[in-house]
């Protein structure tokens, strides 16, 4: 959940900002709801870490899942074209979404960077939690 909250919680606001003019059809209340509710997911990740152990195996599985998701969504589609959420900047031609440049690349770059950031944060948060546990027991070094 930690990795997903960061990756998905930050990707939507990123996309809303990068393609702001394309999302202008949204009512301002809906735009703000989508933006802020997804950013709240990033905050939620740091609430989750308070009660989760962020075990290495579970963290590795989550990171692997989101990396696979990025690969399938943007680079190596399983069936047809890329599978990521359709962006208003990508036209539908003859019933099929055309993943045009640079919209597709911007969305892909955002997703991959956020997966890397989430990976760093899960590892760093786990390390800090372990350090705090060791310090609390007197086994850690300053």
Give the location of each predicted region.
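Small-polar-interrupted transmembrane alpha-helices in polytopic inner-membrane proteins
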Residues: 1-19
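Central hydrophobic cores of alpha-helical transmembrane segments
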Residues: 2-7, 58-69
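Juxtamembrane "helix-exit" motif on the non-cytosolic side of transmembrane helices
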Residues: 13-24, 74-79
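Non-cytosolic membrane-interface motifs at loop->transmembrane helix junctions
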Residues: 23-36
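Membrane-embedded alpha-helical segments of multi-pass membrane proteins
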Residues: 33-41, 113
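Alpha-helical transmembrane segments in multipass membrane proteins, preferentially the mid-helix core
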Residues: 39-56
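Membrane-interface transmembrane-helix boundary segments in multi-pass integral membrane proteins
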Residues: 77-81, 85-124
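Membrane-interface capping segments at transmembrane-helix boundaries
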Residues: 121-139
């Amino acid at each position: 959940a930690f990795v997903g909250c960061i990756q998905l919680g930050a990707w939507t606001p990123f996309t809303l900002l990068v393609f702001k003019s394309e999302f202008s059809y949204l009512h301002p209340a809906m735009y703000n709801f989508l933006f802020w509710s997804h950013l709240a997911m990033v905050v939620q990740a740091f609430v989750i870490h308070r009660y989760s152990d962020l075990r290495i195996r579970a963290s590795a599985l989550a990171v692997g899942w989101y990396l696979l998701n990025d690969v399938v969504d943007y680079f190596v589609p399983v069936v047809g074209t890329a599978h990521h959420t359709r962006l208003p900047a990508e036209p539908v031609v003859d019933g099929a979404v055309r993943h045009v440049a640079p919209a597709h690349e911007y969305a892909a770059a955002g997703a991959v960077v956020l997966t890397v950031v989430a990976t760093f944060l899960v590892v760093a948060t786990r390390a800090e939690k372990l350090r705090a546990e060791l310090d609390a027991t007197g086994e850690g070094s300053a």
